[in-house]
């Protein structure tokens, strides 16, 4: 299920819609052929764009909740089909200081962890991130404080928090990438540790993000080229024969893959699928940095057309252990 906010051409103002697919990758199709929530259903706020930023949470008992809003925090139960409202829409007063420290602006993110219900949201403008806690998804929220203060950036900041493989991560956005601005944002992530009482510490934007991964990549199985920890210069596209691929490669462009475990014996060859419509080129394989040791150079010849793919190989120096 994919819940989105969109302008509604049949009813004035923003609306909430829902699409369905068989996998998180899609393809998705409109579940209802109409909006799930329209602006005439949410009259607490007087502006037309209050139906933004939907967030869905399914509790342990199977009850699903939809939270959303701009200038007011709305919530409603969903029926078992996940595409029908179950009961009346409730508006939580954005100015209630006991529920929202700093006031609620938009972008609610609701989840449950170790018996605590959390509502993380954007406050003010330029936006900071705050959070509240409750004893149930439909209960009274109690303001807890700031997660991320306002910093120079895109004016807005929207949160998401997940636990993954024993680690806790805070996702947010800013305009830090080249060409970024208020409506051209980049997604960021920071790892953090909850307090013993379940409190969230105050976090700050960094350029480094997560310093240690939760696992390693094997170089002895096929790794898609779009598996990227960092890149410069390249772009992605889709091929009818190969699916997603990396293109627009020029001198100095690179892809970084983190935490590759070469094991104790090390590789002997590197193989890649590639094509070249023009003069071909060479791809250097380096470890631990763009200026790191070259362990191999793969020559990509002219293949005639972009869809004339081939597999090309080169010998590599032996390298062991975990490297980027």
Question: Predicted segments — roles?
Answer:
Residues 1-323:
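Carbohydrate-active catalytic/glycan-binding domains of CAZyme proteins
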């Amino acid at each position: 299920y994919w819940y989105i906010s969109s302008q509604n051409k049949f009813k004035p103002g923003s609306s909430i819609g829902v699409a369905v697919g068989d996998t998180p990758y899609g393809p998705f199709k409109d579940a209802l052929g109409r909006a799930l929530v329209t602006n005439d259903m949410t009259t607490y706020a007087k502006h037309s764009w209050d139906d933004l930023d939907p967030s869905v949470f399914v509790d342990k008992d199977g009850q699903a909740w939809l939270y959303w809003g701009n200038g007011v925090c709305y919530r409603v139960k969903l029926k078992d089909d996940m595409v029908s409202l179950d009961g009346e829409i409730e508006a939580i007063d954005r100015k209630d200081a006991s529920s929202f420290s700093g006031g609620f602006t938009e972008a609610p993110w609701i989840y449950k962890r170790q018996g605590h219900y959390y509502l993380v949201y954007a406050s003010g403008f330029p936006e900071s991130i705050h959070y509240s806690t409750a004893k149930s998804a439909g209960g009274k929220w109690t303001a807890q404080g700031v997660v991320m203060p306002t910093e120079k950036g895109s004016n807005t900041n929207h949160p998401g928090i997940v636990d993954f493989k024993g680690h806790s991560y805070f996702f947010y956005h800013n305009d830090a990438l080249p060409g970024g601005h208020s409506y051209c944002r980049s997604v960021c992530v920071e790892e953090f540790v909850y307090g013993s009482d379940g409190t969230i510490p105050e976090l700050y934007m960094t350029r480094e993000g997560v310093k240690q991964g939760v696992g390693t990549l094997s170089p002895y199985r096929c790794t898609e080229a779009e598996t990227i920890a960092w890149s410069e210069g390249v772009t992605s596209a889709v091929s009818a024969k190969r699916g997603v691929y990396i293109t627009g490669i020029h001198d100095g462009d690179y892809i970084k893959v983190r935490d590759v475990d070469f094991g104790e014996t090390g590789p002997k060859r590197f193989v890649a699928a590639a094509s070249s419509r023009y003069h071909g080129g060479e791809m250097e394989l380096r470890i631990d940095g763009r200026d790191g040791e070259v362990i191999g150079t793969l020559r990509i010849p002219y293949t005639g057309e972009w869809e004339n793919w081939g597999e090309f190989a080169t010998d590599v120096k032996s390298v062991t252990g975990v490297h980027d």
